[in-house]
Structure formats: structure tokens, C-alpha cells
Amino acid sequence: MMKLMLFSIIVILFSLIGSIHGADVPGNYPLDSSDDTYLCAPLGENPSCIQICRKHGVKYGYCYAFQCWCEYLEDKNVKS
């Protein structure tokens, strides 16, 4: 009985930790002067996307779905 209780507590704690750290980071796809998204490859951390995101006023971005995604980029800052 004690092992079951301990196991249940551990499962609950890991569930709570996962929900805290699993939160989505807000952001946007930046747009160029033609209202197009910036295409990119390879996926993941991408120096080109980081540079584009810095141009749009945020510190970090990456290549997601072959388009640059900038973390914490607000709607008002999408177009450069």
C-alpha cells in the first residue's frame, strides 16, 4: 500500500512539473516588406532566423515548418 501511495505521489509531481515546463512560448512568424514569411532550412536552431528575429526586435528565433519563428514577437512587430 505504501509503495502504491509513493508511486501515485511521484506520478502527480511529474505531471505538475510537465505542465509547468511544457507551456508554449508566445511568438509569431515575422514578415518581410512583401508580407511574406521568411523561409528557412534546416529546421531547429538557425542562425539566419536568429538574425531575422533580432532585426524584428526579439532575441531568439528558430526554423519551424520551414519558416522563421520568433519567440515573444508581438503582432505589432511582425512586419519590418
From Swiss-Prot:
InterPro entries: LCN-type_CS_alpha_beta_dom, Scorpion_toxin-like_sf, Scorpion_toxinL/defensin
Gene Ontology CC: extracellular region
Residue ranges constituting the LCN-type CS-alpha/beta domain according to the UniProt record: 25-80
Source organism superkingdom: Eukaryota
Keywords: Disulfide bond, Ion channel impairing toxin, Neurotoxin, Secreted, Signal, Toxin
Signal peptide extent: 1-22
Matching CDD domains: neurotoxins_LC_scorpion (cd23106)
Tissue: Expressed by the venom gland.
GO molecular function: ion channel inhibitor activity; sodium channel inhibitor activity; toxin activity
SUPFAM superfamilies to which the protein is assigned, alphabetical: Scorpion toxin-like (SSF57095)
Chief location of this protein within or outside the cell: secreted
Keyword Nucleotide-binding attributed: no
Disulfide bonding pattern of the chain: 40-63, 49-68, 53-70
Family of this protein: Belongs to the long (3 C-C) scorpion toxin superfamily.
Its biological purpose: Probable neurotoxin that inhibits ion channels.
Domain remarks in the Swiss-Prot or TrEMBL record: Has the structural arrangement of an alpha-helix connected to antiparallel beta-sheets by disulfide bonds (CS-alpha/beta).
Protein name: Toxin-like peptide AaF1CA26
Organism of origin: Androctonus australis
The encoding gene: aaF1CA26
